[in-house]
């Protein structure tokens, strides 16, 4: 989305276009997984801090989203912070699956997305369910850790981070 200009200040684009671009350039394993991920990243009941700004029927906890040809999206302002500096050689790139283009090995991310949005998924013989934490509390903890020279476990116990927030469908 970043490469094609579907950014927070730009126009919304059909989700089918986004899915096609992702499938063609980065993930050739089917559109259902890609669209499902795009939808979840725009649902405020699935993601604590949405990374996609949705337009159209992205579903409810009880009902599925409309087909990708009827929905539109663009990056949220928060998601642009995950890519800030990507054009400034801040991360390494590697060839994509076909070798036609490159993709970042990691995102330069200005915030810890895994901690604030959590993660859940299933793979072969494994499952994970990491609930999200509060962005402000995580930010304060990171700032404290960066300011404190050689922090000890006792110092880290002074940081207040509430229990993770559990998502409820």
Regions found by a protein language model. Name each.
Residues 1, 39-41, 46, 59, ...:
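Structured core elements
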Residues 13-21, 52-59, 139:
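Short, conserved phosphate-binding/catalytic loop or strand-edge motifs used
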């Amino acid at each position: 989305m970043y490469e094609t200009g579907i950014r927070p200040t730009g126009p919304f684009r059909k989700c089918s276009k986004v899915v096609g671009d992702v499938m063609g350039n980065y993930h050739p394993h089917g559109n259902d997984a890609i669209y499902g991920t795009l939808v979840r990243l725009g649902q405020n009941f699935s993601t604590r801090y949405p990374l996609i700004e949705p337009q159209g029927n992205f579903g409810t906890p009880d009902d599925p989203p409309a087909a990708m040809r009827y929905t539109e999206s663009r990056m949220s302002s928060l998601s642009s912070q995950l890519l800030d500096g990507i054009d400034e050689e801040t991360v390494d790139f590697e060839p994509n699956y076909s070798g036609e283009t490159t993709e970042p090995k990691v995102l330069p991310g200005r915030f810890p997305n895994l901690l604030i949005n959590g993660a859940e998924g299933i793979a072969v013989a494994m499952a994970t369910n990491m609930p999200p934490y509060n962005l402000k509390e995580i930010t304060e903890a990171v700032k404290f850790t960066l300011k404190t020279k050689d922090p000890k476990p006792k110092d880290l116990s002074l940081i207040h981070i509430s229990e993770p927030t559990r998502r409820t469908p």
